[in-house]
Regions:
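Short acidic, glycine/serine/threonine-rich loops at helix termini
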Residues: 8-17, 107-111
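A translation/RNA-centric and nucleic-acid-associated enzymatic feature enriched
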Residues: 141-211, 217-228, 237-239, 244-252, ...
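A structural-propensity feature for long, helix-poor, extended segments
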Residues: 10-16, 248-281
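Glycine- and acidic
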Residues: 65-70, 203-212, 333-337, 401-402
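Residues forming anionic-ligand binding surfaces in small-molecule and nucleic-acid pockets
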Residues: 46-69
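A glycine-rich helix N-cap at a beta->alpha junction
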Residues: 16-44
Length: 402
């Protein structure tokens, strides 16, 4: 497990949803590498969270590990490592915190090349053009490279590095170093340098080479920009694997789907489309007026023949009239459907509620629900069950009933 402890986007991790309620950690430590954030001001958030956990045995286990992880760690990286170990303690999971002097030492040659020659910018720009030329000229890169794709870290902040002529500047500070001073700083204190989002993959594969890299769609999008950069550094580029996605359906939810005769495939339709489809299926009248359009086409086909024999200038008016009649039929069809939905409002409401249950806030569960909600109900067996059924090399969206 690669712990992104050098990421700076605190906003992305400072809150989570639990049973529909937002729990947020407000801290003044923003702007620094998130792994180094201290936990002194986290206790009120943990107290609030634990109030919602209840008193089940699984809840007491969670409280114990929250205390071990988040109440007894010096920073967020240490706490995260402990909690991930708790979740996957039976699976020999390797946790890598790359914000480390010895690991950074291995990456000094690549960082020195970046400082001196700015090769990341050049190679990523070249690869982006290759993608546009070979696959899609409208391709929009997920990430745009900077001239220097490294940050300089301090205990409280991180700074972009800018090079002008023979000197390096830390943006938003008055620090200025010559090339020799900057390279000496890198050699003596590699832990003070941090790769940005484009150089981080190279760092990752330098210290822990992988046959494959598993990531989300957004992550893979910028990895596609990097194979030329990897070649430049003689680092093997891994096979890119899209991570699993799954929908978890409880037995109760599955029964609701069966009662409404909704397939799991139809669950993924937009809510309006799903409801319209089911209303058409369960109605005792045919709401499809497509047959009227076909009749119109036949009748106007006859008129087209007359126009061709008399005055072809009427052809435009004829086509306009056909379009007008078709729009009228479509409007009538929509009104019939709306009337039927009002008549079957109980079924519409049940389908609406069920769809909201499956896709909270109109989003995938993985974007809204917290793993703790499932752990409370099933304990550690929840993780074990997922490990058994998820196939990392399946190219399908999994629907798991539990």
């Amino acid at each position: 497990y690669w712990m992104a402890s050098e990421d700076h986007d605190f906003e992305e991790i400072q809150s989570f949803l639990f049973k529909g309620k937002k729990i947020q950690w407000n801290s003044e430590q923003e702007g620094r590498a998130v792994g180094t954030i201290q936990l002194d001001d986290l206790d009120p958030v943990l107290d609030l969270f634990e109030q919602h956990l209840g008193s089940k045995p699984s809840a007491e286990t969670l409280k114990k590990w929250i205390a071990i992880s988040y109440r007894n760690s010096s920073n967020l990286a240490e706490a995260t490592r402990k909690f991930v170990h708790f979740l996957f303690q039976d699976y020999s999971l390797v946790v890598v915190d790359a914000n480390d002097f010895n690991l950074k030492k291995l990456f000094v040659p690549a960082m020195a090349m970046e400082l001196k020659n700015q090769k990341c910018f050049e190679s990523v720009a070249t690869q982006t053009q290759n993608i546009k030329k070979t696959y899609n000229e409208k391709f929009v890169p997920q990430v745009n490279p900077r001239p220097i794709n490294l940050f300089y870290l301090t205990s409280k902040d991180r700074y972009l590095i800018r090079k002008e002529e023979n000197h390096y500047y830390l943006e938003d500070s008055d620090k200025k170093l010559s090339e020799k001073e900057m390279l000496n700083e890198l050699e003596e204190h590699p832990e003070r340098f941090s790769p940005n989002v484009l150089m981080r993959p190279l760092y990752q594969e330098t210290i822990l080479p992988n046959v494959g890299y598993i990531g989300g769609g957004g992550e893979l999008a910028y990895w596609f920009q990097l194979n030329h950069f990897f070649e430049m550094h003689n680092i093997p580029f891994p096979i890119l694997v899209l991570r699993n996605s799954a929908l978890l359906l409880s037995e109760k939810t599955a029964q609701k789907l069966n009662r409404l005769d909704i397939s799991t495939k139809d669950c993924f339709l937009p809510r309006v489309n799903l409801i319209n489809k089911k209303i058409r299926q369960i109605s005792n009248i045919d709401l499809d007026l497509g047959f009227l359009k076909k009749q119109l086409e036949k009748q106007f086909g006859y008129l087209e023949g007359l126009v061709a024999q008399t005055d072809p200038s009427f052809e435009g008016a004829l086509k306009a009239q056909l379009a007008k009649q078709n729009k009228g039929i479509e409007a009538l069809e929509k009104r019939l459907l709306q009337a039927q939905k009002r008549k079957l409002k109980d079924q519409v409401q049940r389908m609406t509620d069920l769809h909201k249950e499956i896709f909270p806030n109109d989003a995938l569960q993985e974007r809204q629900l917290n793993v703790v909600e499932f752990y409370l109900d099933h304990g550690g067996e929840f993780i074990n069950a997922l490990m058994k059924v998820l196939d990392p090399f399946s190219n399908e969206f999994s629907v798991i009933k539990y």
